[in-house]
């Protein structure tokens, strides 16, 4: 690397660092930033006389520019040296002149915080800032519930740690921001940092932040080991993670790293590595510091789960109900040992929200077995070659005209090849026509051998169609054919459900069956939208589906003997007209309780509101039960429910 290129990279690294620390809006992934810093270090080690004083390797963070007051730390807050593999870890240990007795703990991916206590009282809280001076966020710190406001130690002490947002809370925060049309946080770390730096303390409070201590600054403690210091701190009332170890040697450190890496997905908060630290405080004092790092500790980083790459195209996938899902085609990138070439974009509203274009640089995250997704678009890096992503007009598979609802774009052709197999699997499933023995694998086998080519072809299957197919003997074939014959006698609402119409589930299908009978598919938009519980989106979906498929539905009527169940409700029941929500695990399937409630004139809803009359709860009931108690909705267990319906 030449000096000119080095200085350009210094400027780029500073730009990325300011965006990260000052605005909580990163312009590059951690992996991309780390790689750039490593390039700078290589040049600087080989050209010591040409090191720029502006290089990020020579400072902790940019000078603070914010609406918060500045507050000086009593002792400097240092960054940590990163190591990425065993050889780098052993090289660090050699420089630290230490081969034994290491303190290790998770490196949580959050925002660093310095707490100052005097006379046992919390007097201030500050961000890391540039290491010497941070932002005074004391008022927000008082809103973090798990930070003790009073401790049993009366001398002056700085307690330092990481503020994190749990993964579940992060998803809830972004869901709320999406509803308010606010920009989404790219990751929990940015959310934690942004939550600490709110001018409105009530926002900090509602974010449910957690503080995990990892060290001390100014103090008059007399311990000889860091592990003793941290035990003392946690005994004051601070949170302790369950993965904290003392390792006798580097082999044990490596074993602990592998163990912690397996827990990465299970931990409720994000981790990006493991902290490895010399436990002997006298040796730590002897080792001292570089310009930027303590020599006695390092961050043993995990493989990146988030990287920057370029979006080079869009593929369209057709789902069971005909919904078109846009999938981003990416320049291949290695994420935690997996080569990622695509990422879901969910729908076209998501494309608009992200304002993503073909040829954009994007940040891609992969978590466990979850499909990779794009979390951020680096618009500042656009080069003028980007292209808009337009809504498709024709189905990519069958070329039929698509229904464009804005958020959802759908193919209405139920014989479309890409949706046919999944349509058949849904059609014969337990909640639909309930054809015993015609499971997913059998459907795929029959489709592969062209024995099933349409939904109707199920009812034209013959004994000879199964002959020669693996696993089919006379008894099995006869049982399956008998099950198909029995399925001809089914309730109308099950048939409507089986068609897989977008937005039309079992409850809506029952309403259509009871309201219109076999003429349900010949109604107007106004007739649909006036049904209780139906909205414009449901009505539009019905109109478009029946417009395309009304003759097919009439053909089905010739194949099936559809029954219209009359719902006989007891108007004198104590639960007549009452709304129930069911949550948790009960002794019988939830559908049985639902049917009983409806037969007694009640209704079952999927969400709790002020209009809910009862919440029937079982074991492991979750947020619905909590919300019901907040709204003072009557909550009953199974025993109380049984007594209620007996009345």
Swiss-Prot record:
Q: Return the GO cellular component terms, semicolon-separated.
A: cytosol
One short Pfam name that applies is: DNA_ligase_OB
Active site annotation, chain numbering: 107
The Gene Ontology terms for molecular function here are: DNA ligase (NAD+) activity; metal ion binding
Cofactor section: Mg(2+); Mn(2+)
Where NAD(+) binds, per the record, is at 30-34, 79-80, 105, 128, 162, 301
Keyword list, A-Z = DNA damage, DNA repair, DNA replication, Ligase, Magnesium, Manganese, Metal-binding, NAD, Zinc
User: Could you tell me which CDD domains the record lists for this protein?
Assistant: BRCT_DNA_ligase_like, LIGANc
Instruction: Write down the PROSITE patterns for this protein, in alphabetical order.
Output: BRCT, DNA_LIGASE_N1, DNA_LIGASE_N2
Q: Quick one: which residues bind Zn(2+)?
A: 395, 398, 411, 416
UniProt EC number: 6.5.1.2
- Chemical reaction(s) catalysed: NAD(+) + (deoxyribonucleotide)n-3'-hydroxyl + 5'-phospho-(deoxyribonucleotide)m = (deoxyribonucleotide)n+m + AMP + beta-nicotinamide D-nucleotide
GO biological process terms, semicolon-separated: DNA repair; DNA replication
Question: BRCT domain: which residues?
Answer: 570-647
Q: What does this protein do?
A: DNA ligase that catalyzes the formation of phosphodiester linkages between 5'-phosphoryl and 3'-hydroxyl groups in double-stranded DNA using NAD as a coenzyme and as the energy source for the reaction. It is essential for DNA replication and repair of damaged DNA.
Give the family, as the similarity comment puts it: Belongs to the NAD-dependent DNA ligase family. LigA subfamily.
Write the protein's name. DNA ligase
């Amino acid at each position: 690397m030449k000096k000119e290129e080095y200085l350009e990279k210094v400027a780029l690294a500073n730009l990325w660092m300011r965006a990260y620390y000052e605005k909580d809006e990163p312009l590059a992934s951690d992996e991309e930033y780390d790689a750039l810093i490593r390039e700078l270090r290589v040049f600087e080690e080989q050209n010591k006389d040409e090191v720029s004083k502006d290089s990020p390797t020579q400072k902790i963070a940019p000078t603070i520019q914010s609406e918060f007051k500045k507050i000086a730390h009593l002792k400097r807050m240092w960054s940590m040296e990163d190591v990425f593999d065993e050889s780098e870890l052993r090289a660090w240990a050699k420089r630290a002149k230490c081969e034994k007795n290491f303190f290790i703990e998770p490196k949580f991916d959050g925002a660093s915080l310095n707490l100052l206590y005097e006379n046992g009282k919390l007097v201030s809280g500050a961000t890391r800032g540039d290491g010497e001076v941070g932002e005074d966020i004391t008022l927000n710190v008082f809103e973090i519930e798990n930070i003790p406001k009073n401790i049993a130690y009366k001398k002056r002490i700085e307690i330092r740690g990481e503020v994190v947002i749990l993964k579940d809370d992060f998803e809830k925060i972004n869901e709320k921001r999406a509803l308010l049309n606010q920009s989404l946080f790219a990751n929990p770390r940015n959310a934690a940092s942004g939550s600490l730096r709110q001018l409105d303390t009530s926002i900090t409070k509602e974010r449910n932040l957690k503080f995990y201590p990892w060290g001390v600054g100014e103090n008059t403690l007399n311990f000889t080991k860091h592990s003793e210091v941290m035990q003392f701190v946690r005994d004051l009332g601070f949170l302790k993670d369950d993965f904290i170890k003392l390792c006798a040697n580097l082999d044990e450190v490596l074993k602990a790293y592998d163990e912690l890496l397996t827990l990465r997905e299970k931990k409720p908060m994000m981790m990006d590595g493991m902290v490895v630290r010399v436990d002997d405080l006298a040796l730590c004092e002897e080792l001292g510091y570089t310009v930027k790092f303590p020599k006695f500790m390092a961050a043993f980083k995990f493989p990146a789960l988030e990287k920057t790459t370029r979006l080079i195209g869009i593929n369209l996938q057709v789902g069971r109900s005909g919904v078109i899902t846009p999938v981003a085609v990416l320049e291949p990138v290695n994420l935690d040992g997996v080569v990622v070439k695509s990422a879901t974009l969910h729908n076209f509203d998501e494309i608009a929200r992200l304002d993503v274009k073909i040829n954009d640089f994007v940040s891609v995250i992969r978590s466990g077995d979850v499909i990779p997704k794009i979390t951020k678009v680096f618009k500042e890096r656009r080069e003028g070659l980007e292209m808009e992503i337009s809504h498709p007009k024709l189905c990519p598979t069958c070329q039929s005209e698509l229904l464009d609802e804005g958020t959802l774009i759908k193919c209405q052709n139920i014989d479309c090849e890409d949706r046919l197999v999944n349509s058949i699997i849904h059609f014969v499933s337990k909640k639909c026509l309930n054809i015993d023995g015609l499971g997913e694998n059998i459907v795929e086998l029959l489709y592969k051998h062209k024995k099933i080519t349409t939904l109707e072809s199920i009812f034209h299957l013959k004994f000879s169609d199964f002959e020669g197919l693996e696993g089919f003997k006379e008894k099995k074939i006869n049982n399956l054919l008998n099950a198909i014959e029995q399925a001809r006698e089914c309730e109308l609402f099950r048939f409507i459900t089986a068609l897989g119409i977008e937005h039309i589930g079992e409850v809506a299908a029952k309403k259509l069956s009871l309201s219109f009978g076999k003429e349900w598919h010949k109604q107007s938009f106004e007739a649909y939208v006036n049904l209780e519980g139906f909205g414009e989106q449901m009505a539009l979906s019905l109109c478009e589906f029946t417009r395309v498929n009304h003759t097919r539905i009439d053909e089905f009527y010739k194949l099936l003997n559809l029954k219209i169940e009359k719902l006989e409700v007891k108007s004198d029941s104590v639960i007549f007209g009452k709304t129930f929500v069911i949550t948790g695990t009960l002794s019988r399937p939830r559908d049985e309780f639902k049917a009983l409630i409806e037969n007694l004139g009640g209704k079952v809803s999927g969400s709790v509101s002020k209009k809910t009359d009862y919440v029937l709860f079982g074991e492991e009931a979750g947020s619905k039960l909590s919300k019901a108690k907040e709204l003072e909705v009557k909550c009953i267990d199974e025993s109380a429910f049984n007594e209620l319906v007996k009345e």
